[in-house]
């Protein structure tokens, strides 16, 4: 990139001598260096987002098309609410591109310099701090937003309201923005986990991310956004505390890290094993009582139904293609949603078992270790030891596997990941 600016500057004097940078000694510092730092971000996903925004601003004729990427679509003028439509795909795509750029920019130009200023010296730890810092920044915005939506909703104190008056074809703009942005975030996470160097918990992350994306899509397309937003709020509660604890660990605030870990432990139980299972129970017991197996057709202002559920598979596909077409609720759909939720609960129960061991260790005076999927061991935190092959010495210890594939890799990775370190004390 700097070569491009050098070429541009070398050609300026031949035609516009009064712009010669030699007459402006601060040209390099004021213009070239900032641009060479910023423009590398405008690559890949971020470049596409920038192009869409530029077209929207500069070409008025393109606004009907580009506005779908920049703003929520399918607003109903009579009510001010929003419906589901194909424009949502464009909005989510732009959100994915934007989040990818924000993640890269915040990590590289905000969080990494902050870590170095605070005394984090090893580059690997700087990267890990930046990754956790970005997660903390994101959820510091979207978890309170989700809590606000939940607190203002009728199902805050009555879980029956999660299912009453289904289907809600139109939803509030804030809820739509929240759901679609969360969907974009998890899609961006899938991209990130495949761009970065693979960790031992790669397959666990992939499975978790795809289950989350599937649940968000099912809740949105089949008009169950109330329960979808509630599940996101419950799952996201610890996504602030966990990266916060890890950031404190990297910065050396060991006592505060232990306190945050205790808060994390309590929040995990309440959000992921009490409220979450209450929601699963509501899916199991309340849904059959409140929602009869039936179908509806048309927009919110022209809704027809209830209609009988067809025997074919087309009624499951139709909402994805025709948002105002037939949408059905059946017992098989309820069981599918419940199965996804319980699969996540199984993963969380496994994690919680190891979290309990960590908590016992903390009470015994040992270093706190967390067991989330972002793996960090002492071996990974240590500096590489040259051995002539490019591998770290720790990777070549007897009994350690340097590679595997398929299900064996996933199982082996899970066992190691759930024993990973989040030491609040640096050794």
UniProtKB/Swiss-Prot annotation:
Q: Where in the cell is it found?
A: Endoplasmic reticulum membrane
Induction is noted as: Induced by exogenous FB1.
Q: What happens when the gene is disrupted?
A: Does not affect the production of fumonisins B1, B2 and B3. Increases the production of ceramide intermediates including 3-ketosphinganine, sphinganine and phytosphingosine, in comparison to the control. Causes significant growth inhibition in both solid and liquid media. Double knockout of FUM17 and FUM18 does not reduce resistance to FB1.
Boundaries of every TLC domain copy = 124-364
Membrane spanning residue stretches: 38-58, 131-151, 173-193, 202-222, 250-270, 335-355
Q: What is its EC number?
A: 2.3.1.-
**Which pathway does the database say it acts in?**
Mycotoxin biosynthesis
Spell out the protein name for this chain.
Ceramide Synthase FUM18
In Gene Ontology terms, what is one molecular function of this protein? Answer: sphingosine N-acyltransferase activity
The UniProt similarity line reads: Belongs to the sphingosine N-acyltransferase family.
Alphabetically list the UniProt keywords: Endoplasmic reticulum, Glycoprotein, Lipid biosynthesis, Lipid metabolism, Membrane, Transferase, Transmembrane, Transmembrane helix
């Amino acid at each position: 990139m700097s070569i491009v600016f050098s070429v541009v500057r070398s050609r300026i004097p031949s035609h516009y001598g009064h712009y010669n940078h030699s007459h402006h000694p601060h040209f390099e510092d004021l213009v070239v260096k900032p641009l060479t730092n910023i423009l590398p971000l405008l690559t890949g996903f971020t470049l596409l987002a920038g192009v869409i925004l530029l077209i929207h601003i500069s070409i008025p004729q393109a606004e009907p098309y580009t506005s779908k990427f920049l703003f929520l679509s399918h607003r109903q003028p009579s009510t001010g609410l929003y419906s589901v439509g194909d424009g949502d795909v464009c909005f989510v795509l732009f959100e994915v591109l934007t989040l990818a750029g924000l993640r890269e920019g915040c990590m590289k130009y905000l969080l990494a310099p902050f870590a170095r200023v605070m005394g984090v010296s090893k580059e690997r730890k700087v990267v890990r701090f930046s990754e956790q810092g970005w997660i903390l920044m994101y959820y510091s915005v979207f978890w309170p937003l989700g809590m606000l939506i939940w607190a203002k909703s009728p199902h805050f104190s009555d879980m029956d309201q999660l299912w009453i008056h289904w289907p809600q074809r139109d939803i509030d703009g804030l809820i739509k923005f929240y759901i679609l942005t969360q969907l974009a975030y998890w899609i961006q996470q899938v991209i990130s986990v495949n761009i970065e160097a693979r960790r031992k918990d790669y397959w666990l992350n992939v499975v978790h991310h795809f289950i989350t994306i599937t649940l968000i899509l099912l809740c949105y397309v089949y008009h169950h956004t109330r329960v979808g937003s509630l599940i996101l709020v419950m799952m996201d509660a610890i996504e602030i505390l966990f990266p916060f604890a890890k950031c404190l660990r990297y910065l050396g605030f060991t006592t505060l890290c232990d306190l945050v870990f205790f808060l994390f432990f309590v929040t995990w139980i309440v959000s992921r094993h009490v409220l979450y299972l209450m929601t699963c129970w509501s899916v199991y017991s309340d849904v059959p009582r409140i929602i009869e197996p039936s179908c509806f057709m048309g927009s919110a202002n022209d809704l027809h139904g209830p209609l009988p559920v067809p025997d074919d598979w087309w009624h499951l596909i139709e909402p994805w293609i025709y948002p105002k077409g037939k949408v059905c609720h059946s017992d098989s759909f309820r069981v599918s949603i419940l199965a996804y939720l319980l699969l996540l609960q199984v993963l969380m129960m496994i994690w919680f078992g190891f979290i309990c061991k960590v908590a016992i260790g903390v009470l015994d005076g040992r270093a706190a270790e967390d067991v989330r999927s972002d793996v960090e061991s002492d071996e990974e935190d240590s500096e590489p030891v040259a051995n002539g092959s490019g591998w770290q010495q720790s990777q070549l210890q007897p009994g350690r596997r340097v590679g595997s594939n398929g299900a064996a890799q996933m199982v082996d990775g899970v066992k190691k990941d759930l024993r990973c370190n989040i030491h609040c004390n640096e050794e």
